[in-house]
Amino acid sequence: MHDINRLENHIADNHVWQMTFRILTMAAFTVYGELPEADAWTDYCYNLWLARFPGLNKDGAWHNGDSYFHVNIRTLVEVPYFYTRLTGFNYFSDPWYQGNALYVIYQQPPFSKSGGNGSSHQKILTPSGTRVGYADALARMTGNTFAADYVRHISARQPDILEQGSTSKAGGLAWFRLQCDKPLPDGPGLKDLPMGHVFPQSGLASFSTNLDDTRKSAMLSFRSSPYGSTSHAIANQNAFNTFWNGQSLFYSSGHHTSFTDIHGVYCHRATRAHNTILVNG
């Protein structure tokens, strides 16, 4: 197999983790018992999941940022759900998923622009159907009531939000929802969360004065990350963004046009494109 001993040691081989690995997993188990090679394929896929996923760390944040997080959603849900049904063990019990629920909420509160990290984050203007659908899946599979309240808050004003993007290639969870009959849990909600949360291993922090009502909330996001500008992360080290009413006030500049063009490098990825606190002031 091409990926053996390479993928395990790659910090973030984006497309493989986003889609190829999930597709390989499902294909390998489909032909298990019919093709001799499938024994090795299934063993590799299962143990690679245990070793490297669901996240690169334990705090639950996504170092590649707010936009490219979304293209991993199907993998983050469908693979552990498959193993859960196969074995009877809930693979969503990994503590990473509880931290990731907080990442979903704090990095982009209901009806707010995203915290502002990673390639193409400027396009993430409000929680998408795939993001809300992911929070819905997390709430059902982990019992996280904060994620459940996040879904209820947004669905109350956007009743069809879970239908938006529900069949998209990377983030659509329609197939999961057809299979999962677990209810949304009840309990503490957004108003019961602390004002802020720090994700120390990923180097992210987000603070909101009113997660329960974005219209009356000021928000600040901050990044100083050991992952640097690797992969789809950008060079916004020691950088912050500020928001009011879900809208950005002081925010990053530029657009993700490509990895190497002048605008993409200097006006989007580079440190000067962000509200960066430099070491010399």
Sequence positions of predicted segments:
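Extended polysaccharide-engagement surfaces of secreted carbohydrate-active enzymes
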Residues: 63, 68-281
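Aromatic-lined, polymer-binding surfaces characteristic
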Residues: 1-114, 120
